[in-house]
């Protein structure tokens, strides 16, 4: 029961947003969220583009400049920054689209690519964070027995696997192209135009919900629970400040994960059930549409949170930053430290 024109972005049709022309049944809902949508998206995507680009560019530059300090988590951080940069480079196109009140100006190829890039970033970020959490758990809970699992080479293979998996599983979104509406305006990021496509979107939703959110979220919770229990158990044996720092890092990472991804996936599921119910009051539908805009903006904002994750992931990145600054100021060649023993490696990984 939407008025024609209350359309949402293509990411929102993962929420089951219906074709507004075919769903105009009794014409009882005369309100739209177009103005709200255009203002929020254009503002949020502008901020995310600027902050995400400079933040991730800086982190990536520092990590590459200190690449001689080899670390498995450095590999994950670099890949996470690359995924963020690929996404934020497409967000200005979305800003232009919403500033022009839903008129696409950049051709069919960029329409497909912009839609695709946001999905790839969303789930690459989730999987990279999950991989980092898993291997951090291995390093802290089993620091000596399983130290060979947490290597730079294995991290590269994991990252390659994540890229291939996400790129292939997100490829269906490349099939959704721009089109001309009844006013001859080119549209992009809009809901599917037939019932068959809507069913396909429903299937994609549950597949991505289970494999792209539930499994990674459970993995992170289990890993961080094991880490916290291990750190608390060993508090009296080793340096308490370093243990508090590790626990604080876990809290920051978990909070960022929950703020960025959980609201979007929960809202998307609720929205699907609402749209498939027989009774859909106009005010409830409009509130749900507004919540789509808010939660989708939060999901996209993970590009801004990730640089903070790099900083709060422990002393290692801050040490890299200090090394980079000293190297830049003194123009002296950095001399790497001697190879660490297994216990030292385990402790270093705990501080990543």
From Swiss-Prot:
An individual GO BP term: cell surface receptor signaling pathway
Cysteine pairings via disulfide bonds: 111-188
Residues modified by glycosylation: 15, 19, 26, 184
Regions of this protein lying in the Extracellular compartment: 1-43, 94-121, 178-208, 267-291
SUPFAM superfamilies documented for this protein: Family A G protein-coupled receptor-like
One annotated Gene Ontology cellular component of this protein: plasma membrane
InterPro entries for this protein: CLT1_recept (IPR013310), Cyst_leuk_rcpt (IPR004071), GPCR_Rhodpsn (IPR000276), GPCR_Rhodpsn_7TM (IPR017452)
UniProt membrane topology term: Multi-pass membrane protein
Superkingdom of origin: Eukaryota
Alphabetical UniProt keywords: Cell membrane, Disulfide bond, G-protein coupled receptor, Glycoprotein, Membrane, Receptor, Transducer, Transmembrane, Transmembrane helix
Localisation per UniProt entry: Cell membrane
Transmembrane feature ranges: 44-64, 73-93, 122-142, 157-177, 209-229, 246-266, 292-312
Chief location: membrane
GO MF annotations in UniProt: leukotriene receptor activity
Tissue-specific expression: Widely expressed, with higher expression in the lung and skin, intermediate levels in the heart, kidney and stomach and lower levels in several other tissues. Isoform 1 is the most abundant form in all tested tissues.
PROSITE patterns the UniProt entry points to: G_PROTEIN_RECEP_F1_2 (PS50262)
Cytoplasmic-side segments: 65-72, 143-156, 230-245, 313-352
Function: Receptor for cysteinyl leukotrienes mediating constriction of the microvascular smooth muscle during an inflammatory response. This response is mediated via a G-protein that activates a phosphatidylinositol-calcium second messenger system. The rank order of affinities for the leukotrienes is LTD4 >> LTE4 = LTC4 >> LTB4.
Additional observations: MK-571, a selective antagonist, was shown to inhibit eosinophilia, bronchial hyperreactivity and microvascular leakage. Zafirlukast (Accolate) and pranlukast (Onon) were also shown to be selective antagonists.
The family this protein is said to belong to: Belongs to the G-protein coupled receptor 1 family.
Protein name in UniProt: Cysteinyl leukotriene receptor 1
Organism: Mus musculus
Gene this protein is translated from: Cysltr1
């Amino acid at each position: 029961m939407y008025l024609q024109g209350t359309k949402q972005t293509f990411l929102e049709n993962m929420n089951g947003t219906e074709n507004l022309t075919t769903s105009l049944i009794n014409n009882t809902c005369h309100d739209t969220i177009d103005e709200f949508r255009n203002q929020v998206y254009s503002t949020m995507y502008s901020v995310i583009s600027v902050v995400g680009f400079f933040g991730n560019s800086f982190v990536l530059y520092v990590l590459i400049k200190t690449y001689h300090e080899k670390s498995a988590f450095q590999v994950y951080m670099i890949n996470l920054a690359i995924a963020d940069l690929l996404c934020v480079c497409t967000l200005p196109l979305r800003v232009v689209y919403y500033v022009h009140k839903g008129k696409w100006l950049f051709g069919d190829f960029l329409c497909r690519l912009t839609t695709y890039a946001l999905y790839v970033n969303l789930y690459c970020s989730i999987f990279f964070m999950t991989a980092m959490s898993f291997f951090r758990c291995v390093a802290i809970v089993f620091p000596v027995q399983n130290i060979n699992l947490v290597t730079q080479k294995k991290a590269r293979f994991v990252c390659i696997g994540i890229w291939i998996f996400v790129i292939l599983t997100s490829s269906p979104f490349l099939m959704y192209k721009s089109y001309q509406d009844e006013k001859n305006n080119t549209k992009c990021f809009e809901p599917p135009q037939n019932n068959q496509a809507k069913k396909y979107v429903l299937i994609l939703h549950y597949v991505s919900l289970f494999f792209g959110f539930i499994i990674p979220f459970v993995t992170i919770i289990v890993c961080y629970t094991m880490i916290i229990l291990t750190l608390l158990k060993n508090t009296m044996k080793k340096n308490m400040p370093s243990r508090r720092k590790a626990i604080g890092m876990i809290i920051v990472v978990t909070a960022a994960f929950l703020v960025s991804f959980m609201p979007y996936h929960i809202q998307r599921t609720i929205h699907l059930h609402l749209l498939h119910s027989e009774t859909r009051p106009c005010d409830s539908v409009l509130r749900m549409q507004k919540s789509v805009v808010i939660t989708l903006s939060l999901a996209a904002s993970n590009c801004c949170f990730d640089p903070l994750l790099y900083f709060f992931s422990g002393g290692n990145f801050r040490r890299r930053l200090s090394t980079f600054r000293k190297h830049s100021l003194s123009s002296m060649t950095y001399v790497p430290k001697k190879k660490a023993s297994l216990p030292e490696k385990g402790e270093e990984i705990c501080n990543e």
